[in-house]
C-alpha cells in the first residue's frame, strides 16, 4: 500500500500518473475507513482527494504554504503528511487526529487552526505579505470551497489579495454545494463559468483583477497536475477554479450530498447507519411548530445561515415553508443585519444559529439589531458542554458575549413547554430583540403550567423555597440543579431552587429576598463562567455576607474534550457541587 509508506509529500514526487491514481484511491479508502468508524466530514473530503494529491505532487510543502478554508476537506492532506495511522489504525489512533487542520498536531504542514468558514484567503494574504517583505519565494495557496464564498471575509480576502498584486494562488473547489445548497448571487456567475468551461464574458474573478484558470474535470489527477503546474511560481494573484463532485467515489454521498456532508459512523458497504433512537429533538419540534404557525402568520420567517438543519429545516420542510424560510449561505453577519431589517419592516424573523457562530456576528447583533431595538428573535442552538467539542467549534461563550450587549434579552428555558412559551412571547412582542438559548440536555417536559408572559425586566422563578442554600440553575443546567437539591436534602439541607429564566441581568428583588435566611448561593450555567450569568450574581452580592459559588466552565480553548471530564475538571459533577456546598457551609 503506497500511503503506508508516504511520510511526507516528497514521497509523491517520483510517482507516475498511474501510481498517483492508486495513491488517490488508497487515500479515499483511508478517509472512508475513518469516517465509517469514527464519524466526521464525508462529502467534502471525498471530493477533494485528487486535488490534494495533485497539490502535494506539484507544490513543495512545507516550503509552499497550503491554507485550507474551514479545513473540513483536509483529511486527504493529513493522510499524505505522515498521519495515515489516524485513518487506518485503531479508534485510539483516529481519536488522536483532529478533524480540522491543526498546527498543534502537525506544525510542519498545518499552518493554521481553522474550523470556521471564509477565512483562508485572508489568512493567506498575511502569509503573502510576510513573504513579500522577507523577499522569499514560496507559493501561497488558499483553498476555498464555493460554499465558503458566501461569507463576507472571503470577499475581503479577495479584495486584499488583488490589492497586494503579488503571487497568490486561490483554488476554488466548486462542488456546487455548501453544507446544503448554495444561496447568493455569486453562484449565478459560478454556474455560468462552469457551463462555459470558464470562458463566459462576465467573470467576477477577472473583474477583481485575478488571473483565472478553469478546470471542469476537478477529480482528474493528470489534468489537475497540469493546471497547478501552470500557475506554480506565479507572481500575480491567480484563481484556479476546479469543478469537483462532493462525495466523489462513494455512491451514497454523491446521491445525497447534504445528508453526507458530515455524519456519524456508518456501514461502508451500503451507507446505512444505525437507526436513530426515537426521542424528541428541539430541531424537529421547532421546525414543526414554525411550519404550523406559518400557516396562520405570513409574516413569520425562519432564517438560517448555511445550517438549515440546525433549525430542523430539512429539504422537505424548506419546500413546505417556501418564501417563509430564507437561508443566506454561510453569512452570519448578513443574517443578523437582515433580520433587523425584516423586523423593522414588520416581519417576525426567527434566526436559528449555533452558539459557536455567534462570535462571527457580534458587531451586527450589537449595532444593527440592538442599538436599533428591532424586535428580531435569535434562536441559539448547541450552547453548552454537550455540543460540538473541537477547539474551533467550542459552544461555551455565547452567554458572556450576548449578555454583554445592552438592549438584548437573553432567555434560558429549562424545558419544552417553557421554550415554546418564551418563543411565542418573543415573536409577539414588538419592543426589543430577544435571544433564546435552546436546551442541549435533551427534551424535558414541564410538570406544572409554565408562564406565558415574560416581561422586559428580569424575573426569576422560585420553584421551591427552602433556607440556608439557594441554587440558581439556568437553562440546560436546571435539571442538574434539581438533582443537587435532592442530594442536599439527603444531607438535611432544604435548598431553595430557582429558575432564573433571564441570563442577561439579575432579579434584584429575588436576590435581596434570599438574604434573610440564606447564607450560600450556588449558580449553575452551561457555559463559560468568566463574564457569565453567575458572575453577575456574585457581583450583585458584592461585600454582603452572602457567599456565592459560581458554577460554570473556566475560560479556555478546549479541544476534543469529553463532556463529563470537562465537568469534573470544573467541579460541576452533581456530587462535587454538593461537596463544595457542604464545605462552604462548614467553613
Question: Could you describe each region identified by the protein language model?
Answer:
Residues 87-97, 163-177, 370-382:
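A glycine-rich helix N-cap at a beta->alpha junction
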Residues 250-359, 364-374, 472-475:
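Non-catalytic terminal/interface segments that mediate subunit docking, oligomerization
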Residues 265, 273-278, 387-389, 409, ...:
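Peripheral docking tails and interdomain loops at the edges
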Residues 41-164, 300, 305, 314-315:
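Cofactor-binding active-site loop characterized by glycine-rich and histidine/acidic residues
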Residues 70-75, 144-151, 172-178, 218-219, ...:
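Acidic, glycine-rich active-site loops and adjacent beta-strand->loop/helix elements
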Residues 1-34, 252-268:
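Cofactor-/ligand-binding subdomain signature composed of acidic, glycine-rich
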Residues 29-36, 96-113, 136-141, 314-326, ...:
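Glycine/charged-rich beta-loop-alpha catalytic/anionic-binding loops adjacent to active sites
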Residues 110-267, 271-279, 283-288, 408-518:
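Glycine-rich ThDP/TPP pyrophosphate-binding loop and its adjacent helix/strand module
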Amino acid at each position: 500500500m503506497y500511503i503506508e509508506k508516504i511520510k511526507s509529500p516528497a514521497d509523491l514526487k517520483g510517482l507516475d500518473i498511474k501510481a498517483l491514481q492508486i495513491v488517490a484511491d488508497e487515500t479515499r479508502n483511508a478517509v472512508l475507513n475513518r469516517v465509517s468508524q469514527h464519524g466526521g466530514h464525508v462529502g467534502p473530503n471525498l471530493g477533494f482527494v485528487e486535488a490534494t494529491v495533485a497539490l502535494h505532487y506539484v507544490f513543495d510543502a512545507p516550503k509552499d504554504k497550503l491554507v485550507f478554508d474551514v479545513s473540513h476537506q483536509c483529511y486527504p492532506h493529513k493522510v499524505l503528511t505522515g498521519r495515515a495511522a489516524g485513518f487506518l489504525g485503531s479508534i485510539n489512533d483516529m481519536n488522536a487526529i483532529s478533524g480540522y487542520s491543526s498546527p498543534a498536531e502537525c506544525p510542519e504542514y498545518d499552518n493554521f487552526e481553522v474550523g470556521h468558514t471564509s477565512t483562508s484567503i485572508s489568512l493567506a494574504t498575511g502569509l503573502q505579505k510576510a513573504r513579500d517583505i522577507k523577499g522569499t519565494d514560496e507559493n501561497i495557496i488558499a483553498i476555498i470551497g464555493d460554499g465558503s464564498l458566501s461569507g463576507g471575509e472571503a470577499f475581503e480576502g479577495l479584495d486584499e489579495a488583488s490589492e497586494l498584486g503579488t503571487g497568490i494562488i486561490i483554488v476554488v473547489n466548486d462542488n456546487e454545494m455548501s453544507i446544503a445548497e448554495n444561496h447568493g448571487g455569486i453562484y449565478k456567475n459560478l454556474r455560468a463559468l462552469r457551463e462555459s468551461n470558464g470562458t463566459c464574458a462576465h467573470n467576477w474573478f477577472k473583474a477583481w483583477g485575478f488571473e483565472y484558470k478553469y478546470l471542469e474535470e476537478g477529480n482528474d489527477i493528470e489534468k489537475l497536475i497540469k493546471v497547478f503546474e501552470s500557475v506554480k511560481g506565479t507572481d500575480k494573484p491567480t484563481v484556479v477554479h476546479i469543478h469537483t463532485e462532493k462525495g466523489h467515489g462513494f455512491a451514497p454521498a454523491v446521491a445525497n450530498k447534504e445528508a453526507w456532508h458530515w455524519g456519524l459512523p456508518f456501514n461502508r458497504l451500503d451507507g446505512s447507519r444505525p437507526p436513530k433512537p426515537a426521542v424528541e429533538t428541539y430541531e424537529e419540534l421547532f421546525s414543526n411548530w414554525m411550519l404550523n404557525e406559518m400557516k396562520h402568520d405570513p409574516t413569520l420567517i425562519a432564517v438560517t445561515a448555511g445550517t438549515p438543519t440546525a433549525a430542523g429545516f430539512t429539504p422537505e420542510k424548506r419546500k413546505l415553508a417556501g418564501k417563509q424560510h430564507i437561508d443566506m449561505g454561510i453569512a452570519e453577519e448578513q443574517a443578523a443585519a437582515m433580520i433587523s431589517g425584516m423586523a423593522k419592516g414588520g416581519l417576525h424573523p426567527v434566526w436559528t444559529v449555533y452558539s459557536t457562530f455567534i462570535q462571527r456576528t457580534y458587531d451586527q447583533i450589537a449595532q444593527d439589531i440592538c442599538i436599533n431595538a428591532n424586535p428580531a428573535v435569535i434562536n441559539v442552538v448547541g450552547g453548552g458542554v454537550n455540543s460540538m467539542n473541537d477547539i474551533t467549534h467550542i459552544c461555551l461563550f455565547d452567554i458572556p458575549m450576548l449578555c454583554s450587549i445592552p438592549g438584548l434579552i437573553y432567555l434560558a428555558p429549562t424545558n419544552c413547554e417553557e421554550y415554546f412559551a418564551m418563543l411565542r412571547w418573543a415573536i409577539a412582542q414588538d419592543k426589543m430583540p430577544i435571544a433564546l438559548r435552546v436546551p442541549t440536555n435533551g427534551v424535558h417536559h414541564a410538570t406544572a403550567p409554565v408562564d406565558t408572559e415574560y416581561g422586559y425586566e428580569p424575573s426569576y422563578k422560585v420553584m421551591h423555597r427552602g433556607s440556608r442554600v439557594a441554587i440558581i440553575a439556568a437553562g440546560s443546567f436546571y435539571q442538574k440543579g434539581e438533582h443537587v437539591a435532592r442530594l442536599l436534602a439527603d444531607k438535611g439541607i432544604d435548598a431553595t431552587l430557582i429558575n432564573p429564566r433571564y441570563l442577561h441581568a439579575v432579579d434584584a428583588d429575588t436576590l435581596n429576598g434570599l438574604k434573610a435566611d440564606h447564607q450560600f448561593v450556588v449558580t449553575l450555567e452551561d457555559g463559560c463562567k468568566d463574564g457569565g450569568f453567575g458572575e453577575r450574581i456574585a457581583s450583585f452580592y458584592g461585600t454582603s455576607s452572602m457567599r456565592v459559588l459560581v458554577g460554570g466552565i473556566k475560560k479556555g480553548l478546549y479541544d476534543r474534550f469529553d463532556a463529563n471530564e470537562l465537568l469534573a475538571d470544573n467541579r460541576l459533577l452533581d456530587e462535587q457541587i454538593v461537596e463544595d456546598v457542604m464545605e462552604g457551609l462548614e467553613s
